[in-house]
Curated annotation (Swiss-Prot):
A GO molecular function held by the record: structural constituent of ribosome
Family: Belongs to the universal ribosomal protein uL11 family.
UniProt-listed Gene3D superfamilies: Ribosomal protein L11, C-terminal domain (1.10.10.250), Ribosomal protein L11/L12, N-terminal domain (3.30.1550.10)
Name this protein carries in UniProt: Large ribosomal subunit protein uL11
Processing after translation: One or more lysine residues are methylated.
InterPro entries assigned to the protein according to its UniProt record, in alphabetical order: Ribosomal_uL11, Ribosomal_uL11_bac-typ, Ribosomal_uL11_C, Ribosomal_uL11_C_sf, Ribosomal_uL11_CS, Ribosomal_uL11_N, Ribosomal_uL11_N_sf
Alphabetical list of SMART domains matching this protein: RL11
Gene: rplK
One Pfam family, short name: Ribosomal_L11_N
Length: 141
């Protein structure tokens, strides 16, 4: 019989920089998970993606063992890196803070496709384009 999942924890951590300090320690500690084992495994899996925030979904089982799935970086992080800006606009309707080319948009959509709720690259591009528009980032051809 399969082990029973007692909790699912979702965190967004810097790639390769997980440590027992908050938010990791308290989130895992309350479920009795070995925090250092998680940190070492997470850092090993994400060391090649340094500089990105990588969301992780941790499944904790009855016997306090765990498994985790790393996701792709948030679209907003990928857009800010592509546009070369620090952060998105607070008032996106009034003006743009940067721009990205349609080819960059397609690359971001291809990266995010496994985590998005769509099957075609065109629909993924529309989702990412909407995120960019809300951040005040213009799309150029």
């Amino acid at each position: 019989m399969a082990k029973k999942v007692t909790a699912v924890i979702k965190l967004a951590l810097q790639a390769g920089k997980a440590n027992p300090a908050p938010p990791v320690g308290p989130a895992l500690g309350q479920h009795g998970v070995n925090i250092m084992a998680f940190c070492k495994e997470y850092n090993a899996r994400t060391q090649d993606k340094a500089g990105f925030v990588i969301p992780v979904e941790i499944s904790v089982f009855e016997d306090r063992s765990f498994t985790f799935i790393t996701k792709t970086p948030p679209a907003s992080v990928l857009i800010t890196k592509a546009a070369g800006i620090e952060k998105g606009s607070g008032e996106s309707a009034k003006g743009s803070v940067g721009s990205i080319k349609r080819s960059q948009l397609e690359e971001i959509a291809k990266t995010k496709l496994p985590d998005l709720n769509c099957t075609s690259i065109e629909s993924a591009m529309r989702i990412i384009e909407g995120t960019a528009r809300n951040m005040g980032v213009a799309i150029t051809d």
